[in-house]
Amino acid sequence: MARLYQCPRCGFQVTPQERARDRFCPKCGTYLRPAEGGGGEGWRRVFPYEPYPQQVEFMGDVESTVVSGGTLVAEACNGFGKTVAALSCLLPTGRPIVYATRTHEQVAQVLREVEAINRARSAGHRAVNLASRRLLCVNDECRLLPLRDAQEVCRRLRSRGECPYESDLDRVPRGLPPVLGVRELVSQARRRGVCPYYLSRKLASKVEVVVAPYPYVFNPSIRRLTGLDLEGKFLVLDEGHNVDQVGQEVLSDSLTERTLAAATQEVQQLQRPTQPLEGLRGYLEEACRGSPRLIAPGELAQELEEALGASIPRVLDEYAPLVERVREAKQSKGQAPICYLNGVLIFLELVEESPRESYVGLFHTTPSGAPLLEYRCLDPSLAVAPLVEEAHGVLVMSGTLSPLETFTRVVGLEGAVVKSYPPIQRSDRIKMTIDTRVTTAYRERTKAMIRRLGKSVEEAAQQVDHGVLVFFTQKGFMKNCLAEWTKAGIVELRRGAPHLAGKRVFLEGRDAQHNQRVVEQYKRAAVTPGGAVLFSVFRGRNSEGSNFPGDQARGVVLVGVPYANYGDPLVKAQIAYFNRVRRGLGNQWYTMDAFRAANQSLGRGIRGRDDWCHYWLLDRRYHQHLDLISEWAKGQGPQVV
C-alpha cells in the first residue's frame, strides 16, 4: 500500500496526495509525519479477536485500497466477521466512517462490534445511529408523519417554541455513552430535555462511526437535511448486493390517482385553480386502462404538459407556494399537516429534471385496481457514482455479490478492486447437491415434475436432522406444490398440520407480524429431535436479513431458479437499457439477479465459523451456471445427480 502519513498527536492518517496539499493535520493542526511501518496493519491495535488467515487477507486489502482512497468490492461468506474487520482497519486512521446498512438488526450489529472493540482494547471509540424521526422523535405531533411533512411540522414547532425538547444544541452534552443506538439516544436525550433526533445529528459530526440506513446515504435530499457529509470520510456499504436496487428506488417515484384526488381537494380548499390537477387526474385514469404500458420519458413529459395545460416548470412555479399554506390550513383545523400537493410537485420535478435516457415511465394499476404511474430510474450508477466521488475511500461488501464482474458493471464500479474471499468454515462442513433431473422451467412444470420435485425435497429432509429451509420461486407456486405434494402423500396431515419426512411444515407468514410468529414457532420446533421444515419464497422475509444459526437450518433446499418475471414491462425495460449501455449486459443482469437471490437464500444456512449445512439445488439450470454460485457455498465441490 502507499505510504501513509499520521498525526503524532491525534493519530489521524492521510494519503501522500493529501499531505502534498497540506502538511498539517486537518483535525488538530499538528505537523504530519510518516506513519510507523508505512501505515499498514493498524488493525492489529484494534481487532478484538484472534484473526483467521482469511480475515488477515481481507484487512490487508481494506488497508491497501480503502485507506489509500480507493474502492474495494469484497465478497465474503456469512459469519466471516466483515463488520469488525472493516472497523478495525478504518478506526486507527482517525478518519470518520459512515457505515450504511439495510436493517435495524444490522445497525445494531455494527454498534455491538464497536462496543466489542472498546471493551477488548479499553478504547473509547464513539459511534451513533442516525435514524428517522419515527424512531427518534418523542413529540407525537410530528413523529408519525411522512418524512417531508414531519420535517415541516418539526420546523414550525421549533420556530414557535412549541416543542419542549431542545433542538438547537451548541455543544454535545457531557457524560454520554460512547456508543449510542436508538434506545440509548432516546433515554439519554429525554433525561437531559433535548431532542434525540437533533442530538444524533449533532453527534454525527463529532463521532468516529456514523451508522445509517441506506436511504440516508443514497438520497441526496436526506443527506442535505441531516448534514451527512461524506467528503473526506470512509463509506462502508454493507449488504452491498442491495446497492443497485436501493439506488434505483431512491431515484424513482410514482403518482397515484388517490394522491391527485387529495391534492385537488387541498387546492380547492384554498380557492385556487384546480384545472391542471384535474386534467392530470383524467389523463392518468385514461392512460392506465388496459394492460401495463411503458412510455419514454420525453413522450411522458409532453403528454403530462398537455394534460396540465401548461409547461411543467410553470406548474411548479404556480403551485409550490401553496404547499406551506396547505400545511398551515390543516394544522389550524387540528389535522395532520400532510400535503399531497407536494408529492405531485416532487414527481413532476423529477420528470422535468432527470436524465431522460436513463428513465422509463410505466402506466399500470395497483392490486386494488387504482391507476398508477411509475417513473423508474434504470441506471443505478446515477446513485452510486456521487457517493464514490465524494467519499475518501469506499468499501462495498456482502456475502452474495457473485458474479462480481457483472455486479461492478451494473453499478458503475468497474474501476474498483474486486475480490472474493475463501470461507472461514472448513470445506467439509458445507455440502452441496445439484439435482439435474428436475426443473421449474415453465414449459416443463407438469404435475409429474412437481411431484418429482416433492420427492427430492422429501429426500433432503430425511437426510438431515433438525431444521430445513425450503425456498420457492413464488408464493403461488409454493402453495401449488404443497397441494400437489399433499395429494401425492409426500406431505401428510397429522392433527391438521402438514408434515414432510416426519417434520412439521411451517409456511412463510402473510405479513411481517404473522411471519415473525411463524418463524418463532418453526425455530422452537427445528431444534427438537423431530425437527421442522419452513417453506418460504426467494426475495421474501426469510431469505434476507433473517438468521437461522445451528440446528435451525441444517439443510437449505432451493426449488427452482428465481428468475424475475420476463413478461414484466419494467424487467424488459431494464434488460433493454443495460443492453444499450453494453452489449449483452442486460441478459447478464437478468441472470445475475436470479442467482443473487439464490445465493442470498443459501446464506441463511451458514451463520458462523463452526456452523455446517447441506444445500440442495433442485434445478438443472444451477449446474449450467455453476460459476454464478457463491464460492463459499460449494464446499469441496457440488455433487451432481
Task: Go through each PLM region and give its residues.
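A substrate-engagement module of RecA-like helicase motors
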Residues: 39-53, 94-210, 218, 278-285, ...
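Signature of the SF2 helicase/ATPase Hel1-core->accessory helical subdomain module
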Residues: 92, 105-112, 192-209, 213-314, ...
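A contiguous, basic/glycine-rich beta-loop/short-helix subdomain that forms a polymer-engagement track
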Residues: 185-208, 220-227, 318-440, 444-449, ...
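Conserved RecA-like P-loop NTPase helicase motor core
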Residues: 436-448, 506-621
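Conserved interdomain hinge at the start of the Helicase C-terminal
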Residues: 438-473
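Conserved helicase motor "Helicase C" RecA-like lobe of SF1/SF2 P-loop NTPases
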Residues: 473-509
